[in-house]
Amino acid sequence: TQSKLANLLFTYELQRRLAPRGKTIAVAAHPGTSSTELARNVPTVLQRAFQVVSPLIAQSPAGGALPSLRAATDPGVLGGQYYGPDGIGQQKGAPVVVASSDQSYDIGLQRRLWAVSEELTGVTFAV
């Protein structure tokens, strides 16, 4: 989705700006698919379908938190890395470094999003 792409673009641009300054790094993570209550307001028929399919493709909410926890706490994490589950389609599994979309690596888009973010918020990010 656009919001996920924007998150990655901003993270990569932030890391590019932080790199010359030293130890602070910017990383990103995604949970894969987690069995949560997000489907509680969908029609009952769909809820039943989710209950059948979910164990096959999703992990627990605790499992979904692991990529973020690793990105935030593992001393081996490097700036600009992106963490997600190692399973098929990055849906579930152990947290590992994963690739993001080709578009997320577009430096021009990263810089443009940074500039638009500053413009729309009226804040110049001191990085």
Describe the residue ranges of each PLM region.
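NAD(P)H-dependent oxidoreductase Rossmann-fold/reductase module
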Residues: T1-V127
